[in-house]
A protein has these predicted regions:
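N-terminal presequence-like segments and the immediate start of the first folded domain
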Residues: 1-97, 102-242, 246-260, 265-383, ...
Length: 457
């Protein structure tokens, strides 16, 4: 039976800061909803005719005088800082979660996650450290295929909480090298950074090693590739959950208190191994979950990366699993969504269910130029989203943030046009990325990661 919660009046508003480039597509630069501020993906464009912002361009006769990633990162982070201020928030003091997306043209997209030898994000990190000086937000940084504006190579989006002070938690696990918070608490909320099955040493300095050189911790490795044994992605996922469980306990939470997991992984052909480890850890009443393939991970050999949102034990904020009438069964062991306090976390939104792809979501072979499949897929998803929102006591107008992962940007314009039809006023903030394909649902052109707002009754 579907759960249903009564509706309450919303205090969600779009933020349009002065002095920051206005998006060229139908989304808001930021959404403020109660204590939460969602910042749309920012990239180094002023959305003018030249695409890349003038501040990020070298003189055409001096193309080697600066590091493009540094210039673009500084431009992006300043715009984010200004957008936060327009929403009454501080990027440094209030940010609790940050996502960073880097174009990685040499990334292995055929079952691995390595972004290619020589790839670095150090210029970005050095710029980030000028803007984020303490209790840095829990972080994810991923290699992706492409961004929407030519020559842009970095995109960043952020979540902030203006109500309660954030605090970085010292965790008894191998320490990340990039200087972010692996565990962060704010009020009743716990955010973990994207974690991996690594000790941040791996084969560095080792004369003997098992299999290809990697940064995977030794107990998360399967036997030598010369033997017929082992499920390498499943084993990494199991060891990763062990680490996350310890992290949550240190933060005053537990795996039972997880409300949403984001799983960044290599390729849909490895999904089944992750799913087996997931079911072992969450046999009943699992949290909401978004699974995103073709991710470039900056720790060689690691697959997957998992980040969690959880609640502190014994806090006032409670969670509730949402299953909506009229919405097909999720693909995999996950609910439609989980409501936690005033936020609604959706599981992977994709244009189908256990019965396959939605009607109209693929052109017939006999009529290869007939139909608008991206429009049909987006409409299918958003009709489901509206039903899930209704079951949670809110409405689709209270969606605050989307991350959209496209197989091919050729379908972007058709899909965003349909998206805009469902949000005629104050559309959610948005981050849109090209990752490649195919996805785990044959014929699907994109997947969405959504967060909604459920105002207090």
């Amino acid at each position: 039976m579907a759960s249903k919660i009564s509706k309450a009046k919303s205090n969600r508003e779009a933020i349009w800061p002065g002095g920051v480039p206005k998006p060229a597509m139908p989304y808001s630069p930021a959404i403020k909803a109660g204590p939460w501020v969602f910042i749309a993906g920012q990239l180094a464009s002023d959305f003018g005719p030249d695409g890349l912002a003038m501040e990020c361009r070298d003189h055409p006769d001096l193309p080697f005088q600066s590091i493009p990633q540094r210039r673009q990162s500084a431009y992006i982070l300043q715009n984010i800082k200004d957008t936060c201020a327009a929403a009454g928030a501080s990027l440094d003091d209030d940010s609790v979660r940050i996502w960073q997306w880097f174009t990685a043209p040499n990334q292995n997209r055929d079952g691995g996650t390595w972004v290619g030898d020589g790839f670095t994000i150090t210029p970005y990190l050095e710029e980030r450290d000028r803007f984020l000086t303490h209790d840095r937000p829990a972080s994810t940084g991923m290699g992706i295929k492409n961004l929407l504006v030519k020559d842009t190579i970095v995109e960043v989006d952020v979540l902030l909480n203006t109500e309660t002070k954030k605090q970085q938690v010292a965790l008894d696990v191998p320490q990340a090298l990039a200087g972010y918070s692996q565990g962060l608490i704010t009020g009743d909320w716990v955010f973990t950074a994207g974690e991996h099955a690594t000790d941040f040493v791996g084969d560095t300095g080792r004369a003997d090693y098992n299999g290809p050189r990697s940064a995977i911790q030794l107990d998360a490795r399967t036997p030598s590739e010369l033997l017929w044994y082992g499920l390498p992605v499943k084993l990494q996922t199991q060891k990763l959950f062990d680490k996350l469980e310890r992290n949550l306990e240190t933060c005053g939470s537990s795996m039972k208190d997880v409300v949403h997991a984001t799983i960044y992984y290599s390729h849909p052909k490895n999904l089944a191994e992750i799913e087996e480890a997931w079911i072992e850890r969450f046999p009943v009443d699992p949290p909401a979950r978004t699974m995103i393939p073709y991710m470039g991970i900056g720790i060689r050999g690691c697959d997957p990366e998992i980040a969690l949102v959880a609640l502190k034990k014994g806090g006032k904020t409670k969670k509730q699993t949402i299953m909506a009438d009229g919405v097909g069964a999720p693909i995999g062991h996950e609910p439609h969504a989980v409501k936690a306090g005033d936020l609604l976390f959706f599981s992977t939104q994709i244009a189908g269910d256990t019965n396959g792809l939605c009607a109209g979501g693929k052109r017939a072979e006999e009529y290869p130029w007939y139909g608008l499949p991206a429009r049909a897929q987006m409409n299918f998803i958003l009709e489901n989203v509206a039903k899930v929102c209704e079951a949670a006591g809110t409405s689709i107008e209270n969606i605050c943030r989307r991350q959209a992962f496209h197989t091919d940007f050729d379908w972007f314009m058709e899909s965003i046009d349909e998206w805009a039809r469902h949000f005629p006023k104050d559309p959610p903030c948005s981050t849109t990325l090209e990752i490649g394909g195919p996805l785990h649902l044959d014929g699907a052109l994109f997947l969405l990661d959504l967060i909604g707002y459920c105002p207090d009754e």
